[in-house]
């Protein structure tokens, strides 16, 4: 055997190769980062939910709206319901974030590496189509796991003893919610609106990490910022805006389908879109966009910034 052939037969050694998190570590790291982010952004989720349900299927006079702007809604809820009102559904939001973002952030890289290996014979490949498919696939997993929790969270956040909008449920806690839903509709009741949740989550997941990675590459290519927190924050902000624009319509549809009782208003997501446009106009699908952006942009910034740190922590434990 020649020297050249001998060299080819030897396994390649790259001392600078970056170690990757496994699925379990990635799931835990992504979920922990998401929980930290949702603690800071949950009040805007409450506001967004109430905006999306306000004036449902009616031509509501703007002067009669309870919630008029993000700032006014924040002040109104804080004044009459306190911090408890602003943080409604927070415990359920934690469980949901572990399921959704744990899958979305934790399984994105393993799925992407697998698809790259299948189609490009290179686990480190960087094709936009594969990145989008990986985001959509990880988001789909998260949506299926997390739909029952988002259902309960939405119903908790829409509840207000002072200024109610939409259907009011008054769940005491997540176990009370599950018990009542199963008693009334069976286990299938926990997955009401899951089709809308999948559309929403897949649309957001398919662009979140690809836009984040693209923004980081552009920053590096043009040498705009040095490696560090500011670079991650900037890339996260760009990603958050892209996610908000992509998923807003599906987010409104999902909120309304989760809030309704026994499909009294909408049969499916398409039916919801058509009825909303006919009754309220096209831009009703963008109700709560300001609150959504106020939530999703900081949430994406905090989540993707935190995950950089939690990944380092878990890689350290994995190495040890």
From Swiss-Prot:
PANTHER family: RE38146P
Organism name: Schizosaccharomyces pombe (strain 972 / ATCC 24843)
InterPro entries, per the entry: Mito_Carrier_Antiporter, Mitochondrial_sb/sol_carrier, Mt_carrier_dom_sf
Annotated localization: Mitochondrion inner membrane
SUPFAM superfamilies on file: Mitochondrial carrier
Membrane topology: Multi-pass membrane protein
GO MF assignments: isopropylmalate transmembrane transporter activity; oxaloacetate transmembrane transporter activity; sulfate transmembrane transporter activity; thiosulfate transmembrane transporter activity; transmembrane transporter activity
Keyword field: Membrane, Mitochondrion, Mitochondrion inner membrane, Repeat, Transmembrane, Transmembrane helix, Transport
Identification of the protein by name: Mitochondrial oxaloacetate transport protein
Keyword Transport on entry: yes
Annotated gene: oac1
